[in-house]
Amino acid sequence: MIDVDVWVRGTSQAATRTIQAVNGDAASWTEADVRMLLTEMLLSLEREKNPGGETPEVSLRGFSWIVSQQDGGVLVHIEMQMGTASAGPFAMDEARLTEMIARVVDRAIQLFGG
């Protein structure tokens, strides 16, 4: 399980949501796991903004992201017009996770346009 801190633009409080679809052992992640992490982080933001709403399709476009170093590992941050989501820390090399996310996002842009 992975906790994601979510803040919806226009609100004054953040919430923590839990992702169960991704193994917490980041050292064993594949690009499919990274894709699922990003997808679930975006869906966590959507669910916080629209609780009880229908789950939208996620195409991994229209957001900014960064991987940052923190004691104990790295964090993944996503920002878009709707708000922000942050997950981690993950026990993984910052450069490796950055490269994996870049490949996953680039592949999504190639498939769906950007």
Would you name each region that the model predicts?
Residues 1-114:
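Positively charged, low-complexity terminal tracts
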